[in-house]
């Protein structure tokens, strides 16, 4: 049985940044372990993206969903730098000012680990105003966002650099390991996995979308109060490039909010 001060389940954005803060603020004196179902970023290879294969071979675990860096690592590496995109950070931390501080800090961390500095895109204010007016006329809202487009290849390098930084400060990465169950024994958490048991004084569960069902099950077992969040339902609408050209020229990955009657 391996023991830690803090155990983290899931090496996605939440788990990695939590480990980063513990490593930096604890100056390497806090014993941290991260249990991750997938593998290190450079080991994640999706057959769909391999020219010689080009199809899903049902890897277990899926390299897209699982692995160090989280589900977004093998996508385009696009980071939305705004508190109310992807969640309501300002509500969680209590103010817009604090939320912006955290957003800017996160961007600095990505740059520290090798994100190219010339990848930041800030939409032109004048063009944004024009699109906002057009959107308002049809009952929609255009949301301008600072975006950093790191790219897939750079994302893997950034995550690998961050992983190396954490390992040099004593953080253990327990990859290829699935967390199965959690018990609390004598004031310690006991995490049962496919590679044995791990114990810790503190436990952070950050299993991502892939582990959402398991997370709910464990939270209920441990008596953690849950608050359901809104459900995002996506609809794919394909249009000719000319239709979106004006908006795409201002925002690479535009966000438009439309409130319908039903």
Predicted regions and their residues:
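Dinucleotide-binding Rossmann-like beta1-alpha1 core, especially the glycine-rich loop
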Residues: 67-121
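Residues forming the flavin
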Residues: 1-86, 126-262
